A protein has these predicted regions:
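Extracytoplasmic catalytic/substrate-binding loops of multi-pass membrane glycan-assembly enzymes
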Residues: 1-23, 32-33
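Transmembrane-helix motifs of polytopic, lipid-linked glycan transferases
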Residues: 40-65
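Membrane-embedded, lumen/periplasm-facing catalytic core of multi-pass transferases
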Residues: 196, 200, 207, 381-448, ...
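Membrane-interface alpha helices of multi-pass inner-membrane proteins
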Residues: 122-137, 141-148
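Perimembrane helix-loop-helix junctions
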Residues: 142-178, 460-464
Length: 568
């Protein structure tokens, strides 16, 4: 089964949009799962987006294509705030699709511009728009922005310059641009995920956990218009307004270090400059108008995207997420990346010669006159300056010794050890085993790694659904973390933050109730031994002495499984 539809033992895996997991899956060509194969798939996706921007540039225009390629290579790093990370950290790119979502959003529009420039089949953009809707559920709006820009460009600007001629087929194609992403979104996020949510609720799962999107939009707009709201929305109004103010602060002030050039206003200024140069460079009035419309509409959509984020922080996210603007950076740079990519697409087309054909009549003879207009060569220099500037700035922040290139093989020892241990453990398991993960002191990353390292053997979510009797709030507990009796919870630190306080009976019920057949003791500590030793037939003696990592779930308790444990 594919990663996208497999039951990975997590509550969300079956609902994740399958675009990126499928991409990762199809690059696992030979052998077992490996992290680097995911990166290969992502890199090919990135380069396909870059090709969409420079694909229309002919070979003789290498003075444009080469520096433009350098600019594109910088984009995924230039507009993110991870450029100061100096320590190796595991990144599972199947879970963070924000950069790919932004690239595909901009790449779809760039591909459309290249298709029109070369009079290629226009329908080829429809699968790209569909893909853009299948990367992340919360970036579906970016797919709609791309579809809207393509649709407006097609509908307003006829190929022959006659608006009325071919209006009906242009209208049909414009509607198809919206239909492609909306069909994918409806089939997956509405029909399929809706079915899973309803099934979860009927099976005593969490069901629907957030306010309906339509109601969020309506009540949020009412607040902006000064109209009164009631109930839940009145309670969250202050949170909504605070989130908007904080987002504005991040955009305008130096506190918002979201890119290599600082806060959001600097990014928008750079994108505006690229659009302005593209308009000036365009050799025909028609192309100038097309670029101006795309630039203006994408700017309006940027405001709408910010409104969507504010509504999410105000009415969908929990209060602490709104107070801290949790993950704001990766939500907003999806738009920045896509916006910059489509601006570069406009610039690439603007730097190409434009041919206009006018028809007339000389008596009974039809006469067509073709005019070829060349852009000014000086505008090509702008691309070179932009490339040099971005490469210089990136070189300042991402020094070779602070990148993957600067780390010795020994830095990857821990990751290799994790993979080796997973392979060893899996060799003692049956294909239908379900593993309960015990990793004391884990913040969730170890459990998350194990989910993929053990596949196709399932690693359980290792938790349960609980409902607060006072507030009625439903939440998942598990996915790694510190397990122990409620009274043994540490006062501070990682173990306190990720503490799951279960009695021995509760833990036993969770393990058996979730259908787990094996416990994987990745890391032990005194809290776990003191809390749950009586559940194990050997009081955890084998695990403490390093004789085993696995315990089989039996009627008599959790029994140690004999295995050869590496001493390394």
């Amino acid at each position: 089964s594919l990663y996208a539809t497999a039951k990975l033992g997590t509550p969300w895996a079956a609902t994740q949009n399958p675009g990126l997991p499928l991409l990762a899956y199809f690059f696992q060509f030979f052998g077992d799962y490996a992290d680097w194969k995911i990166y290969v798939g992502y890199d090919i996706l990135y380069f396909s987006v870059f090709a969409a921007v420079v694909g229309a540039v002919p070979r003789e225009k290498w003075r444009v294509a080469v520096p433009m390629s350098a600019v594109l290579w910088c984009v995924p790093f230039f507009f993110t705030n991870y450029n100061h990370t100096i320590y190796l950290t595991t990144t599972y790119m199947t879970s963070y699709g924000d950069v790919p979502a932004g690239l595909v959003f901009g790449g779809a529009v760039a591909a459309w511009l290249a298709l029109r420039q070369n009079s290629a089949p226009k329908w080829a953009v429809l699968p790209i728009l569909a893909l853009s809707a299948n990367i992340k559920a919360n970036t579906f709006v970016l797919a709609l922005v791309a579809a809207g820009l393509v649709a407006v460009d097609e509908w307003l600007f006829a190929d022959d310059g006659d608006f009325k001629a071919g209006l009906l087929p242009r209208t049909g194609f414009s509607l198809a641009c919206f239909a492609a992403p909306m069909a994918i979104y409806y089939l997956w996020n509405v029909r399929y995920v809706g079915w899973l949510v309803s099934r979860s609720a009927s099976d005593s799962g969490v069901g629907e956990t957030s306010a309906p999107l339509s109601a969020v939009v309506v009540n949020g707009i009412k607040i902006l218009l000064g109209q009164p709201v009631e109930g839940f929305y009145a309670e969250r109004e202050a949170q909504f307004r605070t989130a908007m103010a904080d987002m504005g602060h991040q955009f305008w002030t130096s506190d918002g270090k979201l890119s290599m050039i600082g806060q959001g206003r600097n990014v928008v200024a750079l994108i505006a400059i690229v659009f302005a140069v593209a308009i000036l460079a365009a050799a025909s009035r028609r192309l100038k108008a097309r670029i101006a419309v795309i630039g203006a509409l994408s700017g309006i959509c940027f405001l709408g995207y910010n409104l969507m984020l504010a509504l999410s922080y105000g009415f969908i996210f929990v209060p602490f997420q709104a107070e801290q603007l949790v993950d704001y950076n990766r939500y907003i740079y999806s738009y920045y990346i896509g916006w910059f990519i489509l601006a570069l697409g406009c610039l690439s087309v603007a730097l190409l010669p434009q041919i206009t054909v006018k028809g007339g009549a000389d008596g009974p003879t039809a006469v067509f006159a073709a005019t070829r207009r060349q852009p000014q060569a000086a505008f090509e220099l702008f691309v070179l300056v932009l490339a040099c500037g971005m490469l210089f700035r990136q070189g300042q922040l991402i020094l070779p010794q602070l990148s993957v290139l600067g780390f010795a093989d020994s830095e990857f020892t821990d990751r290799r050890a994790e993979r080796a241990e997973a392979e060893l453990v899996c060799s003692y398991l049956a294909p239908d085993d379900r593993v309960f993960y015990v990793g004391q002191g884990d913040n969730g990353e170890g459990w998350f790694s194990a989910v993929f390292d053990f596949y196709p053997i399932l690693v359980d979510y290792s938790g349960t659904v609980t409902t607060d009797p006072d507030t009625g709030e439903t939440k998942m507990i598990g996915g790694g973390g510190e397990l122990g009796l409620p009274e043994l919870q540490p006062a501070e630190g990682v173990k306190n933050t990720y503490y799951h306080g279960f009695t021995a009976q509760e833990l036993d019920d969770i393990v058996r109730g979730n259908g787990c057949t094996v416990l994987y003791i990745q890391t032990l500590d005194d809290i776990f031994v003191q809390s749950y030793a009586d559940l194990f037939t050997d009081k955890l003696a084998a695990a403490q002495s390093g004789e085993t990592l696995l315990y089989r779930v039996t009627d008599a308790g959790f029994a140690p499984m004999p295995m050869e444990v590496s001493t390394q």
